Each structure stands twice: as structure tokens, then as C-alpha cells.
């Protein structure tokens, strides 16, 4: 069985002091959470800056970390130009005080992207030791296929939204050849495509229902799901958020949930979901309790 892991999403650490961020990062490392997810737009780069200050104070942390950042989103448009990608990566590395990125993701698709130009940017970053691996976020299988046909540095990661509630990428696989709305293929079979091509899936917002509702944990709109989460949390001796994490980890794609908490308490609660191996009945029970159905 593959090792299960979490990543700490750093989108909200701009609201923390350097001391608070240091406590959170130390807690993560001490509990084998070594993957840290950033983006150039998070906190208008304040998140990267605070993280970098923590690394200045604790230079030994770097060798224990996988640091990922993303670029491409601008105010009102997307930009995958060679100049933009290279400029943003260099600034991320400077602010993060990390010398290189372990992973760079292109942040959502750019409809105007010149993939040959992206290829030049990726080659430059790789050959100059600035980025080790590359990936994308929120792309479907055909988009990744197109990039990988032209890129020398292949796409090895795809970060997509996934939770028990926001799980249409799973539903579309269950409803193959059916007439229900769940059968609509919005991702090009992205889970199966990534598994076939050894592309690691990162699941963002693993405890969120949707932007309008926020988290489904203890949300009265999702009472049946919370009843099931409570039942399983009692059985396994953990909090509901740990069960929500274990639901994602149970999938054979061996995904990495990106948990965007700034609370050490919540982080430690979710870490306890790593060793939990839900039964098929429990996994499908959560899926159904969230309002989904089976064909």
C-alpha cells in the first residue's frame, strides 16, 4: 500500500504573525507533513514572504520540505507567457527563501497559452536548477495530454478540487453510459487519466462543499452527511475532519489532500485520518449521505 500523506496549504498564512506561522510549520514537520503548497497570488505574496521569514529563522527546515508554488493567475486574465512564468518563479523563490521550488504548477488553464513558450520557460527553470518538477491545476485530461505532447519537462502533478460533496470527478466514472446529469464528463476522466499516466492528484478544499456553503463539517445543510461522519468518527476515535480526509485517501489514486488550515489543532486532527482505511460500505455510505446517488 502506498504511503498516505497530507500537504499544508498556505493560502491563509498571511493572517498569521511570523511566530504563529513558525508554530504551524513546525507542527506540520513534527507530524510528517512535509509538503507545503503556495501560489504567487496568495495574500498578494504575503504568504510566501511570511513562510520565507520562517525559513530564515530555521534554515534546517528546507531539507525536510517539499515546497510547491503556482503562477499564471493575474487580475482579470491568465498569463502563461515565458517571461511571466520565469519572473514569477524567481520572485517566489526569493520570497520563500528556498533556493528552488520542488514543484511548480500552472494555476488554472490559460486559453491563450503558447505551449512552445511554456516549454521554453520550463526548460529554463529546470536547467537552471530553479524547479525540479512541474504540474498544473484544474486541468482536464485533454489539456494535460496536449501539454505533455509538447513539453520536455512533463506534467507530473494536477491539483483539482475534491471533497465528499464536491466529487463530480468520481460521479462521472460511476455513471458511465447513463442518462443522469452525473454522467456528464466535465474532466475527461481525469482520475483515470492521471492514474494511467502516473500523474499525482492533489485534492484542494477537501472539507469544503462549495464556495457558497463553505465547509460541510457541522453545516446543518449537510445533516445526513454529518450524522455519518459522527458515526465513523466515534468508531475510529477521531474528529469528523479526519474522516473526511480518509475518504479521499481511500481512493486507489493515492491522492494528496491539501489542507488549508492555520490551526495546529485542526492540522493534528486531520493527520489522524492518514492511517484510517474505510471499508467500501463506509466510503460509499459517506458518498450517498452527502446527497449523491448510485446508478
What kind of feature is each model-predicted range?
Residues 16-28, 80-96, 142-145:
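Short, acidic/polar
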Residues 14-15, 43-44, 74-75, 108-113, ...:
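Short, small-residue-enriched loops and turns at beta-alpha junctions
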Residues 4-8, 36-38, 65-69, 104-106, ...:
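Hydrophobic faces of well-ordered beta-strands that scaffold small-molecule active sites
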Residues 93-114:
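Active-site groove signature of glycoside hydrolases
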Residues 9-19, 71-83, 112:
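Active-site mouth loops of central-metabolism enzymes
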Residues 33, 98-101, 131, 155:
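A structural motif
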Residues 113-295:
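Beta/alpha (TIM)-barrel catalytic core signal, keyed to glycine-rich beta->alpha loops juxtaposed to Asp/Glu
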Residues 1-65, 127, 209:
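N-terminal binding-site loop/beta-alpha segment at the start of enzyme catalytic domains
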